[in-house]
Amino acid sequence: MTEARELRAFNFEVRAEQNEQHGTYITGTPIVFDQETDMGWYTETISRDALKDTDLKDVRFLVGHNTSGIPLARSRNNNENSTMQMTVTERGMEIRVDLDTDNNQEARALYSAVKRGDMSGMSFMFVVDKDSWEDIDTDHPKRTIAGIRKVFEVSAVAFPAYEQTDIQAASDGQPLDSARASLESARRQVEEDRAAQAEAERRRALLERLENLTKEVKDNEP
């Protein structure tokens, strides 16, 4: 079965910095815990323990989710030698991306755009391992993501804010489509569960009726 990958993009603080240890780098927080986000179709919160068992190895850092381009950094084993280091804190998941501005023109352009404030958001692609829904039958349900199985990539994005929501509206509409697909999938599951429960209750009622009829027949035997 194909995994349902989801996109989220937010207007969190992204900083361009430089020091002797890491050279030219950017930092940011693509995932924030316990913060309600209006996804357009529903409200979503990522719980504090959502990254407890998440696979953060071999995550790529891209610009605008451009998977056909060369990654600007990579977490590999997510240690001090990685060009992208991902750290889970009390606030969420923070990243540091070491940029090769000496040899990579796109890295130089990104560093400049972040430093100038032209690039102000981060986005991540992931697969949910565990979630729950409240008020699923209402016009604006609530979703809590309790576990994220895998983060595939993190991107710097130019359009992190969607009108009247906190979700990115890219030209292809992917993040919003992803949110809508998640809600539709949850509602289908609820309907399937209700149908299964109704069928189980129907079978129980039928069995009870047969047992009562059998008892009546036995009671009326001479």
Which residues fall in each region the model found?
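Terminal short linear interaction segments
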Residues: E184-P222
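Signature of dsDNA virion morphogenesis modules
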Residues: M1-E184, A200, K215
